[in-house]
């Protein structure tokens, strides 16, 4: 992406996120990273100690990264419930992709020692 991040529409974000999860199961990196944070439209950092003003409409920005591919969307306060419902459905559907982490020999020794 360029220096100024381009946000895609929410529906398109969810479609691409689903594709990221599907592709991570088939090929490429196994991990898909999703982050979210409050967003007020600024492109530069806020000074220390400053907070959102009462008049500001606070929205939420969702970012997803899979390998070198990145996507982002801005969810307005009015659309949060609808978006969260759709996002939750995607996450629940992708839980089948979870794999049990393989423990190293050191971790096996530590857990065995604590059980005794």
Swiss-Prot record:
Which UniProt keywords are present, listed alphabetically?
A: Cytoplasm, Ribonucleoprotein, RNA-binding, Signal recognition particle
Give the protein's recorded name. Signal recognition particle 14 kDa protein
Q: What family does this belong to?
A: Belongs to the SRP14 family.
Picking any one GO molecular function of the record gives: endoplasmic reticulum signal peptide binding
**What task does this protein carry out?**
Component of the signal recognition particle (SRP) complex, a ribonucleoprotein complex that mediates the cotranslational targeting of secretory and membrane proteins to the endoplasmic reticulum (ER). F37F2.2/srpa-19 together with F25G6.8/srpa-14 and the Alu portion of the SRP RNA, constitutes the elongation arrest domain of SRP. The complex of F37F2.2/srpa-19 and F25G6.8/srpa-14 is required for SRP RNA binding.
> What is a biological process (GO) this protein takes part in?
protein targeting to ER
Q: What is its quaternary makeup?
A: Heterodimer with ZK512.4/SRP9; binds RNA as heterodimer. Component of a signal recognition particle (SRP) complex that consists of a 7SL RNA molecule of 300 nucleotides and six protein subunits: srpa-72, srpa-68, SRP54, F37F2.2/SRP19, F25G6.8/SRP14 and ZK512.4/SRP9.
Query: Would I find Signal among this entry's keywords?
Result: no
Question: Which sequence ranges form a coiled-coil region, renumbered to this chain?
Answer: none
Gene Ontology cellular-component terms for this entry are:
signal recognition particle, endoplasmic reticulum targeting
Which Pfam families does the protein's record reference? SRP14
């Amino acid at each position: 992406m360029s220096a100024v991040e381009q946000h895609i529409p929410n529906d398109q974000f969810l479609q691409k996120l689903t594709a990221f999860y599907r592709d991570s199961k088939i090929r490429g990196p196994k991990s898909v990273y999703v982050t979210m944070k409050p967003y007020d439209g600024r492109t530069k950092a806020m000074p220390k100690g400053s907070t959102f003003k009462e008049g500001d409409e606070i929205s939420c920005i969702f970012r997803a990264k899979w390998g070198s591919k990145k996507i982002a969307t801005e969810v307005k306060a009015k659309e949060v419930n609808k978006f969260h419902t759709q996002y939750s459905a995607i996450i629940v559907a992708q839980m089948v992709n979870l794999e049990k982490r393989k423990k190293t020999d050191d971790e096996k020794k530590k857990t065995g020692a604590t059980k005794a």
